């Protein structure tokens, strides 16, 4: 994952997003739905209807970046549409991108013996 500068917030756009959208469509959604500035330097994350595709837009001060990740199996865990815009930490974003439940990360495997 790309390291984020200090002070950068990560916003999740709740609900489903049309994943055919690129920079213009997602930037417009940031402005109209999230009521945020897409050029603010914060990350804005969007999930498709099936839940296996995630897009992130970020303006780094030099230009706009668009990242996409599709899970080979499973779905990205996402807040309900009633939650509105949700902010998460950069650590939670790392969990989210790994397909881990970012709301309650838990170790799923423990070694049974050493050596």
Spans of features found by a protein language model:
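Polybasic/polar functional segments that serve as interface/processing modules
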Residues: 1-115
């Amino acid at each position: 994952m790309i390291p984020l500068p200090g002070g950068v917030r990560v916003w999740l756009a709740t609900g489903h997003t049309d994943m055919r959208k690129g920079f213009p469509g997602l930037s417009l959604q940031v402005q109209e739905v999230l009521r945020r500035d897409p050029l603010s330097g914060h990350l804005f994350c969007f999930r498709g209807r099936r839940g296996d595709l995630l897009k992130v837009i970020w303006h780094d001060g030099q230009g706009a970046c668009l990242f996409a990740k599709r899970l080979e199996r499973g779905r990205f865990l996402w807040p309900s549409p009633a939650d509105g815009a949700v902010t998460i930490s950069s650590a939670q974003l790392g969990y989210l991108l790994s397909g881990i439940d970012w709301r309650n990360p838990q170790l799923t495997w423990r070694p049974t013996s050493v050596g």
